[in-house]
Amino acid sequence: MNILYILGNGFDKAQKMATGYPDFYKYLTDKVKNESALLGKMKSAITENTELWSDMESGLGEFTSATNNAEEFDSFYFELSEHLQNYLKKENEKFAPSDKLKNKFQSDFTTVSKYLGALDKERYNAFINRHSFSSKDISVITLNYTDTLEKILGLSPNI
């Protein structure tokens, strides 16, 4: 049987990590003082709709008209990316999963049915009983920029 898990930012947030856009925006506005003129303009211009990462993406889309200079915009983009990487690195370093969390997570990975509702659990069990699976192959796609999953599973972040 093949099982695929797709993990996004909600996974990190469920681990109590401050990896949402509001957290990064607060970091940008409170902590980043030595900045380019363009980043300063962006921080001043994007003050509303700071709840979702898509809000930042939309704001950046609108903000591209702030310069007609591609080189200046590239520099701004890499500056913003560097701040994001530094922020996520600090958040990532704070995360140290307990043995209890590691064990629970590994158990959850292999016994998905315990989180299903009654009807879905019934269908799942009927499906499993109809087929004879000799093994479970579990794949994970993570869309996060942290190594939260690797820490929980005890894996090298460089795989």
Whereabouts are the PLM-identified features?
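Active-site periphery "cap/insert" segments of enzyme catalytic domains
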Residues: 3, 15, 19, 23-159
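Alpha-helical structural modules in large enzymes and assemblies
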Residues: 12
